[in-house]
Amino acid sequence: MFINSINTPLTMVSLELLLAIVVPIVGLALAGYNASSVLRIQPEKKELTEINMLIAEGGKTFLMREYKTILPTGAALTILIWVAYYVIFHSGLMAGLAALSFALGAIGSAVAGYLGMYVTTRSAAKTAWMGRNGMGPALSTSFKAGTVMGLSLASIALLIITILYMAYSSVLPTPLWAEALAPVAFGASLISLFIRVAGGIYTKAADWGADIVGKVEAGIPEDDPRNPGVIADNVGD
C-alpha cells in the first residue's frame, strides 16, 4: 500500500511537508483578507443593516446552541474512540493519539464553521448594497464571503493533518501513525453533519411554520422581511 511506503523522518522536512504547512497559512491569510474586504462594506440604508444584523445574531445564537448540544456527544465519542483503540492496539499511546486526532478534527471544523457563519450572515446586506453598482460588484462581494468558509475549512484541516503527521510519524512506526491520524476525519464530519442536518431542519420548520403561513393567511409575500419567520428561515439557511 502507498501509505505504508511513506516514512519521512521528522528531521528531514521534505518539500511536500513544507508546502503542506505554507499552503494552509496562505489560505487562511486569503480567507482573512476576503473577510475583511466584505466586512468593511457599510450599507447606508438603515433597513438593510437592521435586517442583516437580526439574521447575523440569530445565526450566531443558533450555532452556539448547536455547539453546546454537540459538546457532550463529541466528548462521549472521544472516550469511545480511546477505548476502541486501546482494545484493538493494546496501547495507551495509540489510544491517546487517536482521541486527540478526533478532538482536533472536531475543533478545527467548529472553528471554520463559526468563521464562515460570521462572514456569510453579514454579507447579504452588503451584497445587496453593492448591487446598486451592477452585477459585478455584487457577485464579487458574495463570492468573497463564500470563500471564507471554504478556504478556512480546507486550510485548517490541512494544517492539522500536517502537524499531526509530523508528530505521530516521529513516535509511531509507519502503519500505526496512519491509524492514529484517521479519526481527524471523523471529528470533522461530526460537526459538519450536525450543522448541515440541524440547519436544514430549522430552516424548513421556519419556512413552513411561519413564512408559508404568513403568505397564505396574512397575505404577506414569501421572504418578505415584515414576517419574523423570514428571519428564522434565513438563520437556518
Label every PLM stretch briefly:
Residues L10-G236:
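Hydrophobic, small-residue-rich transmembrane alpha-helices and their short perimembrane loops
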